[in-house]
Amino acid sequence: MKLVFPTLEYKEKATEYIREFYEYNSEINGSGALDRFLRESTYEEWLVKIRKDIDIANVEKPRVPALTYFYVREEDDRIVGMINIRLALSDFLREEGGHIGYSVRPTERRKHYATDMLKAGVEVLNTIGINEVLVSCDKENLASSGTILNNGGRLIKEKYSETFKEMIQMYAITK
């Protein structure tokens, strides 16, 4: 498994990845808004956006600089997940979103990909000096809370989110 920065060569596979979420009526997290770009714009414009997102000078507030990656299985070059790694936190992300958003395609769940992908994301942040990584999930999402706990997450708060209209949990993963 490897983190791969999106390129034009992954256009068809990325479109297929997003389509699978729609087919399973499943929520898409950590895609760097790829799903919205495919509905309203183009994959190519999304590539421009995620490249701009890396540099704080190009990011319009309240957004923050971020890296978006595909999580790719090397044997067949299949995108099994996506992860959005935020290099800084806004007030909202500090309270409700955290440093990392991620998802695994519905047909590839329960194979520990999320645990391994989150670990890789935490390592990226650790390399740039962020040693306390915040990650949130819906309280009802036991798979995601398990993924976070498997990476050493410590529950730091639980609260009702007016934005998401549900209880969320915020965890800290400390190096």
Place the predicted regions along the sequence by residue.
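Conserved catalytic-core motifs of GNAT/GCN5-like acyltransferases
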Residues: 136-137, 152-169
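Conserved acetyl-CoA-binding loop-helix of GNAT-fold acetyltransferases
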Residues: 101-104, 110-123, 146-150
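GNAT-family acyltransferases
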Residues: 1-99, 167-175
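Conserved GNAT acetyl-CoA-binding A-motif
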Residues: 127-136
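Conserved beta-strand-loop-alpha-helix junction that forms the acyl-donor binding cleft
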Residues: 109, 135-145
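Structural motif
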Residues: 128, 150-151
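Short coil/turn motifs at secondary-structure junctions
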Residues: 88-90, 107, 140
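Charged catalytic carboxylate motif
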Residues: 13, 117, 143
